[in-house]
């Protein structure tokens, strides 16, 4: 089967933004103008096509990245048909992982800003993630019809706060209630969209006389930015003072793809103005899969290899998202980098080293699907029937093995206990948590050995709220949720020698176990080290292992406050036994008793997780942020210059002091600072705090 759309006419783009910039509305309008949805879905009606989980429609925020394929020929049908694969990404800080994995597989992005609130903390986070993956992008300043909207002010913030080089390709005509349309600075014409047909048709008009001077000034900036693309263009510009429309567009495209400039457009998605021009700009200025560098990976001999966006190269693709679908089970979203694969073909998961077979392949339109027979280089689609694939795995041609760069996922930091409300919920909860953990690499599930409770951990409180909510809605599991907890641990700092004796002798068969242990710290990270130093058979061989088991059980149950003990070395060096009364059980209990007594004599301490915290803040708020970290027992480890005059503070802070930090940081810096945190190490809890925890649990 031949390719329907040549790869040069593909655009794989993400639409990213801060929570309320109007990103989902923008995507809805794109689907409307490209003919995919006949009735526009409004977010505030809870009907937006891209927000397809119930939680998203209720909360009015986007949680998962829905992927959609659409086609566009231009506002004036001036292009051949282009295929645009769009990924709508969430804007909330707890879901940054979703944004990260989308950016990893995109070729370009449209970053949406609100014309009133401009650059917000999450937009800074998204921008830094796009920088990390080198994603070329353009900007759409939305909500120009809102009170206080100011396009050029937002362009200024993009320059100063994000350290970017924005080049406006439009100016707004009027703002707030007076917002009428835009001036196209390349054509030097005004564009007015027809409100009667929801902006499906438009007219070019002369630029309003009172705006001509401003338009000419920004037009000059635009042409200068284009001229800087090459020496030839610069010479032509200096001689003629002008460049042709074709030259301007080619130069701006090249500089956008090289990440040297960011083109800026404006409009109001809600009022159906400007989105059509953004689609044209996506086609004219953002890269096709062949415009971006070939993806790098390693082959089965550990040599580095490249895969180009070419149907004739061996098949290679990256699984960037797993979703559970009520009708077909598991959907694996993949981005194809090279080659072709048909439904029914065998592929190789090079990360897991397993063969998989592609069952059906579907192209997603939000959560509706069309079945297709094959996917080719540059495609984004979902496969049904893959058995053991997780986010970040490479799927490739079994005869040409490659592992593409894996995505890195942060360690979860916050933990809550969940308990099923009934016996029926118990079984369903296990299945539900397993499926949710497969979908989301930043979410983990474990069982607390002492209490038997199920603990779930994730990136933040909203993250875990949504998980609990999805268990109820999608899997019908009712559960009670505990308060967020810190995972403390225990260890020892000193040495001791102790005797453990368990004797029960009162007529008939008794119990007799007797051991001497030497207890001391092990190397960090070693866990439990057991040394058998028994000589001359004072304890028979069959009773040695039970002693180790008894010690290990006591370690899991803790000695101070019931938290597991880490990094201890126990040497069994003496003891005695009884011919009749000794048993495995008796020695297990003796070992456990000796360890508890010995650990309490060996300077036991409580450990807490320290988090590596990185805060990006404008200089004005630096003193407040550092003062607050000191109050939270934080240790400042250093400071760096960030982009656009921001400061980056590196610190280590106990997790117990970080609950509610996102809210506190927002209010302390008027929402200008952002932070990330990940687990660093376990460290001793200060005595006064440890005593309180031990008193509570002991």
UniProtKB/Swiss-Prot annotation:
GTP binds at residues 17-24, 88-92, 142-145. Signal peptide: none annotated. InterPro entries: EFG_II, EFG_III, EFG_III/V, EFG_IV, EFG_V, EFG_V-like, EFTu-like_2, G_TR_CS. GO terms for cellular component: cytosol. GO terms for biological process: ribosome disassembly. GO terms for molecular function: GTP binding; GTPase activity; guanosine tetraphosphate binding; translation elongation factor activity. Keywords: Cytoplasm, Elongation factor, GTP-binding, Nucleotide-binding, Protein biosynthesis. The keyword GTP-binding applies. PROSITE patterns: G_TR_1, G_TR_2. It is found in: Cytoplasm. Pfam families: EFG_C, EFG_III, EFG_IV, GTP_EFTU, GTP_EFTU_D2. Belongs to the TRAFAC class translation factor GTPase superfamily. Classic translation factor GTPase family. EF-G/EF-2 subfamily. Catalyzes the GTP-dependent ribosomal translocation step during translation elongation. During this step, the ribosome changes from the pre-translocational (PRE) to the post-translocational (POST) state as the newly formed A-site-bound peptidyl-tRNA and P-site-bound deacylated tRNA move to the P and E sites, respectively. Catalyzes the coordinated movement of the two tRNA molecules, the mRNA and conformational changes in the ribosome. NCBIfam families: EF-G, PRK12740.1-5, small_GTP. This is Elongation factor G 1. It comes from Vibrio cholerae serotype O1 (strain ATCC 39315 / El Tor Inaba N16961).
């Amino acid at each position: 089967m031949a390719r329907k759309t040549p790869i040069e006419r593909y655009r794989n783009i993400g639409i990213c933004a801060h929570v309320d910039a109007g990103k989902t509305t923008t995507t809805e309008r794109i689907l409307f103008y490209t003919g995919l949805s006949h009735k526009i879905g409004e977010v505030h009606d809870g009907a937006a096509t891209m927000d397809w989980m119930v939680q998203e429609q209720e909360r009015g925020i986007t949680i998962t990245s829905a992927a959609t394929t659409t086609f566009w020929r231009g506002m004036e049908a001036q292009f051949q048909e282009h295929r645009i694969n769009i990924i709508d990404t969430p804007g909330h800080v707890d879901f940054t992982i979703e944004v990260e994995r989308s950016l990893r597989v995109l070729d370009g992005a449209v970053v949406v800003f609100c014309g009133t609130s401009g650059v917000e903390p999450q937009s800074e986070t998204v921008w830094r993630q796009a920088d990390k993956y080198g994603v070329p992008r353009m900007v759409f300043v939305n909500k120009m019809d809102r009170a206080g909207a100011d396009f050029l002010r937002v362009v200024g913030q993009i320059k100063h706060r994000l350290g970017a080089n924005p080049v406006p390709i439009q100016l707004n005509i009027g703002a707030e209630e007076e917002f009428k349309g835009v001036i196209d600075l390349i054509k030097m014409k005004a564009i007015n969209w027809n409100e009667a047909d929801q902006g499906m048709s438009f007219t070019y008009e002369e630029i309003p006389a009172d705006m001509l001077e401003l338009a000419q000034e920004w037009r000059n900036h635009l042409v200068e930015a284009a001229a800087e693309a090459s020496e030839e263009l610069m010479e032509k510009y200096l001689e003629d003072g002008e460049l042709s429309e074709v030259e301007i567009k080619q130069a701006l495209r090249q500089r956008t793809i090289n990440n040297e400039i960011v083109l800026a457009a404006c409009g109001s998605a809600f009022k159906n103005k400007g989105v059509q021009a953004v689609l044209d700009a996506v086609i004219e200025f953002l890269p096709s899969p062949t415009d971006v560098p070939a993806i790098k990976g390693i082959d089965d001999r550990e040599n580095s290899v490249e895969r180009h966006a070419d149907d004739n190269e061996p098949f290679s693709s990256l699984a960037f998202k797993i979703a559970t679908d009520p009708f077909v089970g598991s959907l694996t979203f993949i981005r194809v980098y090279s080659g072709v694969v048909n439904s029914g073909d065998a592929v190789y998961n090079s990360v897991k080293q397993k063969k998989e077979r592609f069952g059906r392949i579907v192209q997603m339109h939000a959560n509706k699907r069309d079945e297709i027979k094959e996917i080719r280089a540059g495609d984004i689609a979902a496969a049904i029937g893959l058995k053991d694939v997780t986010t970040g795995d490479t799927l490739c041609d079994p005869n040409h093995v490659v592992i593409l760069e894996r995505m890195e996922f942060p360690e979860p930091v916050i933990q809550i206990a969940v308990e099923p409300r009934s016996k029926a919920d118990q079984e369903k909860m296990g299945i539900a948590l397993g499926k949710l953990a497969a979908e989301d690499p930043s979410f983990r599930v474990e069982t607390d050995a002492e209490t038997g409770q199920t603990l779930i951990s994730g990136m933040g409180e909203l993250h875990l709220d949504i998980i609990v909510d999805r268990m109820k809605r999608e899997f019908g599991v009712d559960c009670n949720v505990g308060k967020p907890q810190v995972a403390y641990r225990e260890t020892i700092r000193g040495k001791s020698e102790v005797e453990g004796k368990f004797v029960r002798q009162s007529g008939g068969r008794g119990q007799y176990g007797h051991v001497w242990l030497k207890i001391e710290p092990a190397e960090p990270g070693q866990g439990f080290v057991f040394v058998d130093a028994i000589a001359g058979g004072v304890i028979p061989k069959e009773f040695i292992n039970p002693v180790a088991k008894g010690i290990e059980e006591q370690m899991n149950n803790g000695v101070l406050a019931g938290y597991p003990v880490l990094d201890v070395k126990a040497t069994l060096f003496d003891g005695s036994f009884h011919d009749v009364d000794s048993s495995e059980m008796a020695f297990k209990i003796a070992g456990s008793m000796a360890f508890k007594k010995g650990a309490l004599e060996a300077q036991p301490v409580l450990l807490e997780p320290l988090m590596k915290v990185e805060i990006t803040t404008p200089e004005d708020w630096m003193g407040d942020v550092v003062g607050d970290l000191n109050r939270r027992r934080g240790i400042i480890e250093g400071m760096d210059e960030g982009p656009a005059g921001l400061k980056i503070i590196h610190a280590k802070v106990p997790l117990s002091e970080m609950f509610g930090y996102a809210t506190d940081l927002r209010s302390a810096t008027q929402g200008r600072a952002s932070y990330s945190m990940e687990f660093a190490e376990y460290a001793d809890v200060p005595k006064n705090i440890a005593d309180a925890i031990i008193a509570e649990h002991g």
